[in-house]
Amino acid sequence: MRKGASNLNVSTAQRAAPMVSEAPIVMDCKLDKIFYGNFMAVRDSHVPIRKNEITGFIGPSGCGKSTVLRSLNRMNDLVKGFRFEGHVHFLGQDVYGKGVDPVVVRRYIGMVFQQPNPFSMSIFDNVAFGLRLNRYKGDLGDRVKHALQGAALWDEVKDKLKVSGLSLSGGQQQRLCIARAIATEPEVLLLDEPCSALDPIATRRVEELMVELKKDYTIALVTHNMQQAIRVADTTAFFSVDISQGTRTGYLVEMGPTAQIFQNPREQLTSDYISGKFS
């Protein structure tokens, strides 16, 4: 895992040109405008997501991090008044293109939410839920086991698969939700502050799991914890808020390798944020 940078605020003269990752872009996300009704939540944000990397989204509350994340697999379609201008290119196709089924999009771009949300059913059925929904024809037991192993949970629950997922601890519930997400073998995992409701020990387990999972998946992570971004993210995108005429619109300030963002940010606004001058 990444170690925290010792110098989080450097002068413009010290800033070096960022080293751009050579990993291929899995998702090219051009978010021109995102609306909820007449309210513009996000503007002018271009966010490339690279294969087998963790891309962290950081920024103050209300800057649109979660709105951006939920736009990547069309979860925001479920919100009344949502409107999207731009494109999200994934596997050679715009997920907002005409005729694209958002349910199919979410099959390939899975999501784990801030609060662990296991269903009121057994551990096994929680993991098998998406497989059954997608009419999986293979060995369900093997696939569930594989997903639980991938989420580093199998050894803890293998003897109680018929027990309710709600009986697990908070950290175990979040790993169960991750197992449920990876059971359908998505290409991309979207994690919306997955550790915010967890204690430090459970947080460490999930962070270790994220680093392990990126070997097989591409991950986008929203986090309020800058130290978490330093520890796990390969690339970090910093968002801020434009406040005008009583409204708050989020936008991307800069994006680059995590070490560069935290040690040598190009923008003064980024430097001010990571040094604690505003939050």
Curated annotation (Swiss-Prot):
CDD domains: ABC_PstB_phosphate_transporter. ATP binds at G59, P60, S61, G62, C63, G64, K65, S66. Part of the ABC transporter complex PstSACB involved in phosphate import. Responsible for energy coupling to the transport system. It comes from the Bacteria. GO terms for biological process: phosphate ion transmembrane transport. Residues 26-274 form the ABC transporter domain. Its main location: membrane. Belongs to the ABC transporter superfamily. Phosphate importer (TC 3.A.1.7) family. It is a peripheral membrane protein. GO terms for cellular component: plasma membrane. InterPro entries: AAA+_ATPase, ABC_transporter-like_ATP-bd, ABC_transporter-like_CS, P-loop_NTPase, PstB-like. It catalyses: phosphate(out) + ATP + H2O = ADP + 2 phosphate(in) + H(+). Keywords: ATP-binding, Cell inner membrane, Cell membrane, Membrane, Nucleotide-binding, Phosphate transport, Translocase, Transport. The complex is composed of two ATP-binding proteins (PstB), two transmembrane proteins (PstC and PstA) and a solute-binding protein (PstS). Pfam families: ABC_tran. The keyword Membrane applies. SMART domains: AAA (SM00382). It is found in: Cell inner membrane. This is Phosphate import ATP-binding protein PstB 1. Its EC number is 7.3.2.1. One of its GO terms (molecular function) is ATPase-coupled phosphate ion transmembrane transporter activity.
